[in-house]
A protein has these predicted regions:
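Hydrophobic, membrane-inserted alpha-helices
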Residues: 75-79, 152-157, 175-183
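Hydrophobic transmembrane alpha-helices
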Residues: 156-160, 202-210
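Aromatic-anchored segments of alpha-helical transmembrane domains
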Residues: 33-34, 102-108, 175-186
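Membrane-interface loops
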Residues: 39-54, 84-168, 216-233
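N-terminal transmembrane-helix/juxtamembrane module of multi-pass inner/ER membrane proteins
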Residues: 2-76, 122, 131, 233
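Interfacial helix-loop-helix junctions of multi-pass membrane proteins
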Residues: 119, 123, 140-144, 179-207
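Short hydrophobic alpha-helices at membrane interfaces in multi-pass membrane enzymes
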Residues: 166-178
């Protein structure tokens, strides 16, 4: 029964994401978590620079944007899966850019840790409770560049030239990315320069992935993992 379940499971997974796209997709998530939590574990007690501007201080706290801030994880999952369903070369070009961006984030998080000023949460309403919960589980660090903004912009860049993706969904993805940018500002999770840094880093890394041959390095490594996955599936 277990063998039959695993066969059905793999058939279902490969039906969503081709075998060559599975490793880069999963590793993207794993590496992102390692960068974010690892840099926090290393630099959590270090001095953090506050780079918020006067404009940041004047912008209001709008907790309703937490809907976008939390909901964007669904947006990320959907679009990264759409990217992983592309042709092999495009998959590795995109995820090469994705990995490079996280390497840059890790360097910046350790070389120049940043923080910001968060509002005092004193109410007992649903939005106050949600904001308080977010602040309690997500320390004000690893802010520049904003990974929320970086990933959201990647979500748009990764599908904008896909002919199989409807134009309306490309527009939706662009709109959602911009809403995520706004959510990071109005929930006081990030400041303006964090947003700009995330978008610029995503754009630069995406160009590197598309215009250089760096993807071959990642693709060779990914191919070895892909073969091991296929061998494992064959023995199920």
């Amino acid at each position: 029964m277990r063998r039959e379940f695993m066969k059905r499971f793999w058939k279902y997974v490969i039906g969503i994401v081709p075998a060559y796209g599975l490793f880069p997709l999963v590793f993207s998530f794993v590496f992102n978590c390692l960068v974010y939590s690892g840099s926090r574990a290393i630099a959590g007690g270090w001095y953090h620079h506050n780079i918020e501007s006067n404009l940041d201080l004047r912008l209001p706290f709008v907790p309703q944007f937490l809907i976008i801030y939390f909901g964007c994880y669904v947006f990320w999952a959907v679009n990264y899966i759409l990217v992983a369903r592309q042709e092999r070369e495009q998959v590795y070009r995109f995820f090469t850019a994705d990995i490079i961006s996280r390497c840059v984030c890790l360097i910046i998080f350790l070389a120049y840790p940043t923080t910001n000023t968060r509002p005092m949460i004193e109410g007992n309403g649903i939005w106050d409770l949600l904001a308080g919960w977010l602040y309690s589980i997500d320390a004000a660090d690893n802010l520049f560049p904003s990974i929320h903004c970086l990933v959201s912009w990647f979500c748009f860049l990764g599908i904008k030239d896909q002919k199989r993706i409807p134009t309306w969904y490309k527009g939706v993805s662009f709109t959602l990315a911009v809403l995520v940018f706004l959510s990071t500002i109005f929930t006081k999770q990030h400041v303006l320069v964090d947003v700009a840094g995330g978008v610029i880093l995503a754009q630069v890394c995406f160009i590197l992935g598309q215009k250089t041959e760096l993807w071959h390095i990642y693709e060779r490594f990914g191919t070895k993992i892909e073969k091991k996955i296929k061998i494992g599936r064959a023995h199920v």
